[in-house]
Design a protein with these regions (language model features):
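A contiguous active-site-proximal alpha/beta segment in oxidoreductase catalytic domains
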Residues: 1-33, 54-55
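Short, hydrophobic alpha-helical segments
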Residues: 6, 62, 66, 209-220, ...
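C-terminal hydrophobic helical "lid"/dimerization subdomain
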Residues: 11-14, 232-241
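Alpha/beta-hydrolase-fold catalytic nucleophile elbow
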Residues: 23-25, 80, 149
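Rossmann-like dinucleotide-binding domain that binds NAD(P)(H)
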Residues: 32-141, 227
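Short, hydrophobic/amphipathic alpha-helical packing segments
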Residues: 51-55, 209, 233-236
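C-terminal glycine/acidic-rich active-site capping loop/insertion
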Residues: 84-124, 144-227, 231, 249, ...
Length: 277
């Protein structure tokens, strides 16, 4: 979806200039497995789970069409992390009973939001990617939402706006099969249900696999390589650092780069209570 939109916008970008602002969110009601809830095993909470995706796609769409994935230079990161729903005693107990993870002792964030600022090295133009992620989206299921704003043009995506919808009444609800076959993290089995007709393509798996195979066949590195993944990880850690210190993290500072190299967030150390409560 995003890749196709960028290809369609290429002629517009050539005439008007690249996107200046990207806003991305990925939200659902919480992970399936206990280890994903445990910050000491997963490395954090929703920021390290899904914030990495939102930061990555923001960087991608802000990059001028035809440029490498790391063309834009990350300049700064500003973020906050919070424990909202799953910090309430009632829901902490539910999580402990269901997953065996005690957020009274080792909590992780269930909400994060932030801004990454990038600079175009050719024009010095600054552009921004805003990200928002949560583990408390209890609507229909997993939602991916994004929009991009450029001079004179824009795009918008919402994965729950499906061309296919199903309605299941109360009498038929007991006969409904596993609703996750229709939508990941589905939270309902009756009413008006959204159906994602091609999740593998929506989440980028098809493009990534095709690029990996094509790259391997000609002996070149993939479009999204190890160094790119390491940079996304660094941006996530900078977001945790920003939330902990309550200030913008400037990635152009040498001391900051040195600190990030061995940085481990308090949340990932099991000390989230120091910053979330």
């Amino acid at each position: 979806g995003i890749r196709a939109q960028m290809e369609q916008l290429a002629p517009v970008q050539a005439q008007m200039g690249p996107l200046a602002l990207a806003r991305s969110s990925e939200e659902h009601s919480g992970p399936h497995e206990p280890w994903f809830w445990d910050p000491t095993r997963q490395g954090g909470g929703v920021l390290s789970d899904m914030g990495c995706h939102s930061i990555a796609v923001g960087w991608y769409v802000l990059t001028p069409v035809g440029k490498p994935a790391t063309f834009l230079e990350p300049i700064s990161v500003s973020a906050t992390t919070s424990l909202l729903k799953w910090g309430v005693p009632r829901y902490r107990k539910e999580l402990l009973d269901r997953m065996g993870v005690d957020y009274a002792k080792t909590p992780a964030e269930d909400f994060c939001t932030g801004i990454v600022t990038f600079k175009n090295p050719e024009t010095s133009q600054l552009v921004q990617a805003q990200f928002t992620n949560s583990w408390m989206y209890d609507k229909q299921g997993l939602r991916l939402a994004m929009d991009g704003l450029g001079p004179g043009y824009a795009f918008e995506l919402n994965s729950l706006k499906s061309p296919l919808e199903i309605f299941i009444g109360d009498q038929a609800a007991e006969a409904a099969a596993d609703t996750e076959l229709a939508l990941e993290k589905s939270t309902a089995s009756r009413g008006l249900l959204a159906v994602e007709t091609n999740e593998a393509d929506l989440y980028g798996y098809v493009d990534e696999i095709q690029d990996a195979v094509a790259s391997f066949q000609v002996g070149r590195d993939a479009f999204l390589n190890f160094e790119y993944g390491a940079m996304i990880t660094k941006l996530c850690q900078a977001a945790y650092m920003s939330a902990e210190e309550g200030k913008t993290i400037y990635l152009t500072d040498k001391d900051t780069q040195a600190a990030l190299k061995n940085y481990k967030s308090l949340i990932s150390q099991g000390r989230g209570a120091e910053v979330l409560f």
